[in-house]
Amino acid sequence: MDLEYGPEYERFRHEIEQFLAETPRDIDRRSFLLAATELGYVYRHIPKRFGGSEQPFDPIRETIVAECFDASPFPWRLGPQSTGMIVPTLLEAGADWQRERFIPPTLLGDAVWCQGYSEPGAGSDLASLRSHARLEGDEW
């Protein structure tokens, strides 16, 4: 198994590192994300009409971006809860009005999402939920 990225991906890594090195340290989050999106470094698989850069999904590039951003001096991370769970769900199953209303502010960090559920015996693993019904008189 070859775990090396290869020249194409190393060039991509170098581009991102150069972008991060040249970005002013006092840049605000919104401007930073807009610039990174315009260059195709973040939100690659999200359509342009929602604020993405509309490129094919590439898990290796996604990994390189995450590694470079995590190693950067910038305090922002690409909120996996918001952009990794909510946005793909909206793209796949959301109504048009939901996509238009929620995706753009989520990508810019203006909307932050979280999960708020926990069930006895399952925690946050909703796939392991169990239920049962019991007939009591005429009602279940």
Predicted regions and their residues:
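Mixed-charge, polar/low-complexity N-terminal
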Residues: A66, S72-F74, A93, C114-G116, ...
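Glycine-rich, Trp-frequent "lid" loop and neighboring beta-strands that shape
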Residues: S53-Q55, W97-W140
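Amphipathic, small/basic residue-rich leader segments at the start of a protein or domain
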Residues: M1-Q81, Q98-P105, E136
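Short, solvent-exposed loop/turn segments at the edges of secondary structure
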Residues: I60, P80, G84-M85, D110, ...
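Conserved short loop/turn motifs at secondary-structure junctions
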Residues: K48-S53, I86-E92, S118-G121
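Residues at alpha-helix boundaries and the short loops/turns that link adjacent helices
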Residues: D26, E92-D96, G109
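N-terminal glycine-rich flavin-associated loop
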Residues: R77-W97, G123
